[in-house]
């Protein structure tokens, strides 16, 4: 779902150059002139056909004036009135494009005069203009990525580099196929960025070590994890770590072949906490799961946005509402 959004323009017009072209021999013709110090504004994420403002020019001969515009952005100008509006293919976002250049041309029937302008974009609070449903998505994004079910984090955690998983323990052909199926489902959700998860053949080339076996086997392999799971009823566990703001290493223990358990522990490794959508909706991130637990549609969107190329590792709780809101509006 792609929404066309338009940022607030403070259309600040600076005369970088002013050229005239006269193809006739009418030396008595007066060139048209742009009105000085014009400025315009429009809200970020405004709708298609929203008006930025009207470029004004005058002609001492009272000739009829015709306007045209050239810009890398999809901007439209009314040739008779000079009103600039947003084109259908315009996606204007303050966070990625704080200003836009354009050239306005005015023609009086004899002479063309050009004016280079800079359109500056003003930021808005994206969360404030979301629908109620969109705000619910943001709130649930916060719940999962800030681990609000337990000790809430102050910023999100996510992987910077692709995951490379080494499979260890009692890995049967059938279970390896299950792992690949789960990875395929996850990878389909990373379509807004460059992140991916793959299986590798050696531990040396991996950054994720997945072990399939019983809890007792973890005591020798990962003593620190065994201290956590000993005496508990856990069927799996994941511990991730990183450098700076990005995750880059994970250890995952799995004791059951059900697909939902692997999805669950991989979700934790990717930076997601437990869900509160468990009584009826059966999220794959519920603390207690069965084969019936799976990705909810809203969770698929959350994974897409978490691993969007513009979602920065370490985005703080204070920044999160507008960061996610911006991605919702742009996608």
Q: What positions do the PLM features span?
A:
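Positively charged n-region of N-terminal signal peptides that target proteins for export
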Residues: 1-4
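Bacterial Sec-dependent N-terminal signal peptides
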Residues: 10-35, 111, 124-138, 320-331
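Acidic, turn/loop-rich segments in luminal/extracellular domains of secretory-pathway
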Residues: 17-23, 28, 32-33, 39-50, ...
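Envelope-exposed proteins and targeting segments
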Residues: 53, 159-163, 206-208, 248-250, ...
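Short, charged/polar, Gly/Pro-enriched secondary-structure boundary elements
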Residues: 91-93, 127-128, 215-220, 291-292
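Disordered inhibitory propeptide/activation segment of secreted metzincin zinc metalloprotease zymogens
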Residues: 125-173, 181, 187-188, 237-244, ...
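Metalloprotease/metallohydrolase-associated module, dominated by Zn2+-dependent proteases
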Residues: 129-131, 232-257, 273-331
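Metzincin-family zinc-dependent endopeptidase catalytic domain
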Residues: 173-278
């Amino acid at each position: 779902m792609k929404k066309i959004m338009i940022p607030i323009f403070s259309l600040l017009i600076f005369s970088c150059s002013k050229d005239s072209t006269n193809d006739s021999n009418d030396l008595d013709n007066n060139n048209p002139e742009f009105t000085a110090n014009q400025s315009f504004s429009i809200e970020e994420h405004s709708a298609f056909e929203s008006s930025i403002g009207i470029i004004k020019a005058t002609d001492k001969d009272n000739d009829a004036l015709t306007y045209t515009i050239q810009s890398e952005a999809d901007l439209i100008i009314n040739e008779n009135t000079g009103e600039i509006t947003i084109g259908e293919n315009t996606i204007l976002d303050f966070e990625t494009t704080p200003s836009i250049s354009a050239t306005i041309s005015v023609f009086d029937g004899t002479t063309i005069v050009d004016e280079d302008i800079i359109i500056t974009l003003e930021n808005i609070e994206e969360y404030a203009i979301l629908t109620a449903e969109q705000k619910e998505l943001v709130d649930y994004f916060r719940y999962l990525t800030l681990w609000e079910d337990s000790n809430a984090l102050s910023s999100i955690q996510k992987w910077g580099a692709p995951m490379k998983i080494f499979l260890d323990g009692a890995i049967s052909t059938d279970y390896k196929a299950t792992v690949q199926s789960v990875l395929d489902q996850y990878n389909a959700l990373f379509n807004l960025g460059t992140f991916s998860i793959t299986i590798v053949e050696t531990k040396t080339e991996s950054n994720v070590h997945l072990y399939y076996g019983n809890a007792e086997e973890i005591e020798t392999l990962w003593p620190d994890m065994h201290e956590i799971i000993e005496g508990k009823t856990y069927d799996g566990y994941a511990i991730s770590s990183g450098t700076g703001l990005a995750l880059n290493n994970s250890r995952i223990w799995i004791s059951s072949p059900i697909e939902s358990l692997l999805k669950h522990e991989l979700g934790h490794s990717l930076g997601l906490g437990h869900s509160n959508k468990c009584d009826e909706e059966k999220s794959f991130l519920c603390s207690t799961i069965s084969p019936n637990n799976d990705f909810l549609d809203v969770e698929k969107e959350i994974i897409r946005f978490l691993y969007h190329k513009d979602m920065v590792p370490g985005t703080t709780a204070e920044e999160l509402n507008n960061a996610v809101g911006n991605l919702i509006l742009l996608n």
